[in-house]
């Protein structure tokens, strides 16, 4: 594909976003694994005062880095690849919406419960985010299949990475929990703990690889 020229160093921005995402995704994975194992960073006298700050930074980075990477990827695409442009725009829209809704819930700008029931506004916003999440998964899969079939080199590797993300989402969020519940029942806590660990490691690895491949495409 023909590449554009830019007045700002978008490669450097994409590089920082990719590294930040990888670092904090691994930190989030370690945090979750420790929590599953019954450990906590808050028991450390060194990390007690800074752990809330780290968690806040982690949440912001994991929400904002995908916006930057997908936005830059969309910006670098030529006009001829309309399908990829539309899929990228959907991904940016989803991550922006998720960030806004996340901040609304975290800052208590939206009332979640009233008289022991979920408020109508909270239900609408949650449904909207879930719907956009499903649409973004489909858009990511469509983009991945298109990249695999129509392109070569780093673009094709990015397509494979996006397909792997979809497979990880399908297995870890849908098939694996149902299988574990069917086989082990709801009394085998060890089975669910093991499933959660496998899901977290698989999903984190898939996303890190996908954003690395996206950075490689942007860097061309």
Which residues are covered by each model-predicted region?
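Transmembrane alpha-helical segments of multi-pass membrane proteins
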Residues: 12-22, 82-100, 159-172
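Alpha-helical transmembrane segments of polytopic membrane proteins
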Residues: 50-64, 123-137, 192-204
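Membrane-interface helix-boundary motifs at transmembrane edges
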Residues: 74-87, 148-158, 219-220
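Alpha-helical transmembrane segments in multipass membrane proteins, preferentially the mid-helix core
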Residues: 133-160, 208-216
């Amino acid at each position: 594909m023909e590449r554009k020229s830019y007045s700002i160093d978008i490669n450097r921005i994409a590089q920082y976003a990719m590294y930040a995402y990888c670092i904090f995704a691994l930190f989030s994975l370690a945090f979750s694994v420790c929590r599953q194992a019954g450990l906590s960073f808050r028991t450390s006298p060194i990390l007690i005062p800074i752990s809330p700050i780290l968690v806040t930074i982690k949440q912001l980075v994991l929400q904002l880095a995908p916006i930057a990477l997908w936005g830059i990827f969309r910006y670098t695409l030529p006009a001829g690849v309309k399908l990829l442009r539309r899929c990228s725009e959907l991904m940016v829209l989803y991550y922006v919406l998720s960030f806004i809704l996340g901040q609304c819930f975290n800052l208590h700008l939206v009332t979640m419960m009233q008289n022991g029931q979920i408020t109508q506004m909270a239900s609408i916003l949650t449904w909207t985010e879930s719907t956009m999440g499903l649409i973004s998964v489909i858009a990511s899969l469509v983009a991945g299949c298109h990249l695999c079939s129509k392109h070569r080199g780093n673009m094709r590797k990015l397509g494979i990475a996006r397909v792997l993300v979809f497979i990880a989402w399908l297995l870890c969020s849908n098939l694996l929990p149902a299988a574990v519940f069917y086989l082990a029942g709801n009394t085998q806590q060890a089975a669910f703990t093991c499933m959660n660990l496998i899901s977290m490691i698989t999903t984190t690895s898939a996303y890190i690889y996908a954003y690395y491949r996206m950075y490689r495409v942007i860097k061309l």
